[in-house]
Amino acid sequence: IKLERAIIKIQSVKSKLLTDNVGFIRISQFQERTADDVALAYTKLADQAPLKGVVLDLRNNPGGLLQAAIGVSAVFLPEHSLVVSTRGRTPENEKKYLAVLRDYAVGNESPDHIAQVPESAKSVPLVVLVNPASASASEIVAGALQDHKRATIMGTRSFGKGSVQTLIPLRVKNGETTGVNFTTARYYSPSGRTIQAKGITPNIAVDDTPEGNYPSFNLRESDLAHHIEVTDGKNEDAKAAKKETDDAGEEAFDEENAKVPTLRYMFGDDKDFPLEQAKNQLLGKKVITHAETQAKLKAEAKTAKEKAAKEAAQKEKAKAKTDAKGESK
């Protein structure tokens, strides 16, 4: 068998028009063409119907190119808006990235589809879905749209990969080259929030299913050994916010007889619970939040516990009655 080494290009953007004229755009990772593809996807959706809103799905998106993240943000933000900044120990690591062509351009491709996106993209109601597997570039986009109050972030707190790596080329013998990747800076959202080990906290916490969160989705940067910790005083409020969304659903799993989510779905299908809640948010309907899901699970666990205790008491009473009859004989 002959195998040829090659770069596998994946279609990173998928879109469709949902019921009630709500657009759905899913990004699986940030590649060279991702930003242009998002711009084209929005244009196509806007041509199909007068959009009542758009859901931008970044769940399970591990990140990718910084330029692509800036470009996707630029689709929905006014030109020249601050998207993200970096800070490090040296002046060359102090940078600001704006929603402009020079910061999101990848190569010399033309035309600039982002500049040609309909003006409605800057004002259409927008919900961004994230989960603990949304990392790096995904968090840059979510943080920018949240800080500019351009979108409502829904789901569970993101991964928290906010470190910047720089490749230092090294020359070895025989003319071969290699390199070492160093962490040199951190990413900060437009308002100055660090992403590192904190992630993006949703405006509205929503579980993966009506039965709670999938346990497998709850690993984050802050759970990894020797991760880069953040000690900025500015982020004390993030610690308080973390209590609400960190490991969402954990309390329910600690309850005796609590349910483990069994519902499995594909992102974007009709059983996608967070997507349904995102649609409800855009349409002004009732949203089932994390707090409500947990309250329901706790109530169900309490009811099940009381029922089991009642049944056990009845069995014990029946047994005592039987034993008493036996003794009387």
Indicate residue ranges for each PLM-predicted region.
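C-terminal "post-core" interaction segments
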Residues: 2-4, 9-329
